[in-house]
Amino acid sequence: MPHPVSQRTPGSTRLLPADTNQARGLADYARDFLHHPQPVGASTLGLLERFHVDSVGCGVSALARGANAPTVLRREALASAPAVGSRGAICFGARRPVAIEKGVAADASAVREWDSNGTNFGHDAAKGRTAGEFGHNDFYPVALAAAREAGLDGDQTLRVMLLIDEIRGRLAEVFPLRNYAIDHVHHGAVASAAACAAALGGDVDAIESAIGMVVAHYVPYRAIRAGHQLSDSKGASAALSAEVAVSAARRSLAGFIGPKDIFRNPLALYRRNVPCPDGQSPFDLELGLGGDAFAIHFMHFKLGLYEHQSAGALQALVDLFARCPGLAADPDGIRRVEVAIYEPAFSIIADPAKRTPTTRQSADHSLPYILARTLLKARATATTGATPGWNELMLLPDDYDAERIADPGIAALIGRMAIIHGGPNYDARYPDGIPTSVTIDHAAFGRLESGLVCHPLGHARSDQAATETLVDLKFDRLVAGAVEDPAALESRVRLAGKSVEDVAELYAFPIHGCDPG
């Protein structure tokens, strides 16, 4: 459970100034973090475990339901063999080792497929680093694969996971990739290359090389998120970036020399997009070393399947249902729904193409669809006499199947919705919050206003005890039917205190309907 700020322990940090070789600084930092560790706070480790368990629930569910991208990538991985001298990686639900980079791609794709695992909007107000780049806790399979290869125990593996989250989280605070049409997973690829190379024993030169290769050769663009209907490439973006990050790390460890000092390279993406004097990168980078001085405390949980920038609107509906109990039972009486949101959310989940989704990937990034489906779920709950809250309204895979996407009731509700840009007052509150308001004009109840919602449940600044309860419930619902015993699975994948042997086989549990390899 994320602890309140008052219960966190202070911790030291390391600053990598803009006028230094930050790629080499990251390499030094990664080696020190793993091989000369300072104690990490209990709050940080507990939060990290929860994000990892949450990601496993998402991945298991996607595979059990036959989601296309992770199934294709898992099949590809299971057809591969580890390199000579390698222990290989383990795919979710299989026991036979596979090529490391392919196993990582398969597992990361499964984790990300539902778009329901942890998220961040790079923001550290206390340090004035508020670039607000997106990111997700997609890259834990990189840590698991590196741990299996290096023979790490559970506590050491947690440090590799934390290292990945820290590097990508801090990069998200200082460099907004989206402004340059670059996909947010690139920060995760940089973090994965550094952490993987360090965990496998790479020296500073090898780690710097791996980082340089990822930046010079493998930059993903947001083309995967444009167009009327989104494809498998959207959900698999992190997986494919993790795959090349691991390949870059292993290639560098084998002696390949990639570009050095990549953050100050005038033709690399950083200075190319943000021109600055020779000898400088566009940003300072400060990274946690111990205590609870880590970016993970600014990361958020999703309480179901939805693009996280819609969470403010979902919280607004929950609040309105509590305030006006009759609303949930009568969505037909809604004459108009007006939602005011901020940029960049307005351009991402409210563009005109999102009003008529036909694929799951488009529906879970469509604010109109998410709200319409929630209104229909609320009506079903109201028929039982209950007031719909987050528990009852949790969006799950069935809410995005073909039948529900094509439901005429969805289209009818979307036709009464208007999503507007809330303007500077809303924009200024992001990325600290998810500023949203919902106003409903109802035939029986008149004008209903949610007021401004900034920190919905699941947000790092929301009620953490309530969030924890719902995240646990989400895990149970996602893996129900996919494994024999959800509680046993939750216990199995917690890493603290686990042996080297436990870690090596952590994901080798049966999943109903999956090829055991």
Predicted segments, located by residue:
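Residue-level detector of well-ordered alpha-helical segments, enriched
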Residues: 47-51, 138, 156, 160, ...
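Well-ordered alpha-helical scaffold segments within catalytic/enzyme domains
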Residues: 59-62, 142-150, 193-200, 248-252, ...
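Conserved, well-structured ligand/cofactor-binding cores
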Residues: 49-50, 127-140, 149-158, 183, ...
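Well-ordered alpha-helical segments within folded domains of soluble proteins
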Residues: 136-144, 188-195, 242-247, 310-314, ...
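Short connector loops/turns at beta-strand edges and beta->alpha or beta->beta junctions
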Residues: 139-140, 166, 216-220, 288-292, ...
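Glycine-rich, mobile lid/loop segments that gate access to catalytic sites or pores
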Residues: 147-243, 247, 261, 266
